[in-house]
Amino acid sequence: NHINAVRTCHYPDQIPWYYLCDKEGIYMIAETNLETHGSWGKAATLDDTWNVPGSVPEWEAMTLDRAKTQFEVLKNHTAILIWSLGNESFVGETLCKMDQYYRNQDPDRLVHYEGVFWQPEYKSRMSDIESRMYAYPKDIREYLEKEADKPFILCEYMHDMGNSMGGLNTYMNLIDEYDMYQ
């Protein structure tokens, strides 16, 4: 079935899972316990002063504490290839500081964050990977053919709603076609 990697979405998992992945050679994206889905804007507009954690200084200590806790608990697990800053928490200076924390503590592992997609001006400052959720295959192909300066991971897709796994073969065909896509 060609599965060799997992993402611990949307927060760290039970410790036995990490030991199992270490033992069986399964690569992991270890995701920080941070999700602020639904608090990105007000009145249907994106507003940097409203985003949580965004660039709001009051959220910096809390988000860094979550990154530090995850790092200290999981740093010795060999299965972890990538640290993830969290899930659907928009983007901003606070997340840039989390990215920098992981890089300072563990320069040999990659950093992942999907939310940078929403504000491309942060792409040069965080995440080693271009990552999106529920992107259409045509958008993935467009990135891989025109912009591919970072590997692309579709970190969440085929949600079991609506078409319920319909079209999976289209995503799998792209994986076979492009080396920079997982």
Region spans (language model):
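Phosphate-binding active sites in nucleotide-utilizing proteins
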Residues: 2
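Substrate-binding/catalytic cleft of secreted carbohydrate-active enzymes
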Residues: 5-182
